[in-house]
Amino acid sequence: MSKRVLILTGDAVEALEVFYPYYRCLEEDIQCTIASPVKKKLQTVVHDFLPEMETFTEKTGYKIDSHASVDEVDPADYDGLIIPGGRAPEYIRMNTKVQEIAAHFLKENKPLGVICHGQLVLTTVRKYLQDREVTAYPACRPEVEAAGAVFVEQTLHVDRNLVTGQAWPDLPKFMKEFFNVLKKAEKVNS
């Protein structure tokens, strides 16, 4: 049976952090569903790092369809979850169904990949984040630590079922580790 991965996001998602995982999943013959608070064509954004800037820049990116609203999603139907960054996590984390989906993957120890600002979603399900080691975009560190997680100063970190990355330049290693965790989970559940 084919594996199924859910990507949980919304408008202002970092373009690379949604497109790269989506197409990598398809390349691996994994069914991949993009879900957002409202099923629609999502507007992505492009973040870049310029030497003269103290923070990243943001420009309008491509659009991508979400396949389902979060209200249509049963997390039990999915083998893995990816939460991309960008600004989408700032507002989708307030959606109770988004919180339920994130909690399901942490509680059930199912493969979960979270990159950049995506960790902001996890801060809403603190009881499952306690003492978990994560990395994130460095500006998210105070919120991640306030939620009880241990911030690790690495560009990529794996804590059991949880794969975390700092930013889009880490996507190749991030997806490699996410697929490793997905394969291990498949062996355990076989």
Regions of interest found by a model, annotated:
Residues I115-G118:
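Short, thiol/selenol-centered motifs that function as redox-active sites or metal-ligating centers
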Residues A136:
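Short, basic/aromatic beta-hairpin or loop at an interaction surface
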Residues M1-E108, L120-E133, R141-S190:
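Extended, subdomain-level signal for the structured scaffold at the beginning of enzyme domains
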